Regions:
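Bacterial N-terminal signal peptides that target proteins for export
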Residues: 1-7
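Bacterial N-terminal signal peptides
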Residues: 9-18
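Carbohydrate-active catalytic/glycan-binding domains of CAZyme proteins
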Residues: 20-339
């Protein structure tokens, strides 16, 4: 793309995002769902997107939404200008509180000059957070561990990373952790990404009894890119895994057509580790041309609203450089067959 084209595209994106930000501000007090933009596979983007972020806040990305903590929805997200992880809360998934930083970067550690891409689990009376620490000048990423009694004030359990790249397929980076607590097995289950630091290449799996010492799966990597030329044919990353009512596991993930073009898809596995099968309806959420997410739709965070029979999916979208948070929903719990 020519420099002139890039400048024009940037101006258009700024105009679009300014309009979206104004629309979001006007609806803040309404606390209701407006209309949605519908896709062919049943997923609908909220028309008031983005629901969090704007030019003043700067880039917000890689969200993780959980229920516990005094509000129905608690969104932990990466706040790029602050190099930190922040929390925003909401009663409806649309209108979010002003963010507060819950964990700052720690340049003195030598491995977390910036921190981002976190996952939080409420278990045994505490909030357990695993997060990505990065040193971009040497293109490396590690995973750290922190805990909190209130979900806001986190303290590091150890000053050292709890997961580091060791295998060939991990390259210089392990990042994007997503953790579930399995009380039956008495372990934490982690899905994480590895490979390159800018955008990872594959998805891997590990287990831990204490959240500090992790055993990586012999089946790693457990999830690869799609076929050449497919919507996710360049690489995969940024996943969340949920247990379905029938006992199977569903993974929502980022699929990359190329390094700059990303969409969101899903796959299903019986054990959450092996034999992942992509949904036939993929991609589930993709960029809307000319909109605030016109270049890429990244890292999904998903809530299964069984009471109302729907899925809620938050993601970070990009048009040009800035990234903000949007919402998509799917009425009905059935997401279709696998390929």
């Amino acid at each position: 793309m020519s420099t002139k084209s890039i400048i024009i595209a940037g101006i258009l994106c700024t105009m679009i995002l300014s309009s979206c930000a104004l629309g979001k501000k006007e609806q803040k007090d309404e606390k209701v769902f407006k209309s949605f933009i519908t896709t062919d596979n049943g997923w609908k983007k909220y028309e008031g997107n983005p629901v969090l972020g704007g030019p003043e806040m700067g880039t917000c990305f890689d969200v993780n939404v959980i229920e516990e903590g005094g509000a129905k929805y608690n969104m932990y997200f990466s706040w790029r200008p602050q190099k930190s992880i922040a929390l925003s809360r909401s009663d409806d998934g649309v209108n979010w509180s002003e963010p507060v930083i819950v964990l700052h970067e720690n340049p003195d550690s030598g491995w977390e000059e910036i921190i981002n891409r976190s996952t939080t689990v409420y278990w045994n009376g505490q909030y357990h957070m695993w997060y990505t620490g990065q040193v971009m000048r040497i293109q490396c990423s590690r995973i750290g561990y922190a805990v909190s009694d209130d979900g806001i004030n986190f303290r590091r359990v150890t000053q050292e990373p709890v997961l580091v790249p060791e295998r060939v397929y991990e390259g210089l980076s392990v990042m994007n952790p997503y953790v579930l607590r399995d009380d039956e097995k008495g372990v934490f289950r982690m899905w994480y990404c590895s490979g390159e630091c800018y955008e990872p290449n594959v998805i891997c799996y590990a287990e831990s009894k204490d959240g500090i010492h992790w055993e990586k799966s012999p089946y790693n990597p457990v999830f690869y890119k799609g076929e050449e030329g497919a919507w996710d044919g360049d690489r995969v990353g940024g996943c969340e895994v949920h247990r379905l009512p029938d006992g199977r596991f569903i993974m929502f993930y980022i699929g990359y057509y190329d390094i700059d073009t990303a969409r969101i898809g899903a796959a299903i596995s019986d054990d959450g580790i092996t034999n992942w099968k992509r949904l036939a309806a993929n991609p589930l959420v993709e960029p809307t041309q000319g909109s605030w997410d016109g270049d890429a739709c990244y890292k999904p965070s998903v809530y299964l609203d069984a009471q109302n029979g729907r899925w809620m999916l938050w993601y970070n979208g990009r048009c040009g450089a800035p990234e903000y948070i949007g919402l998509a929903t799917h009425e009905g719990l059935d997401l279709g067959e696998t390929e």
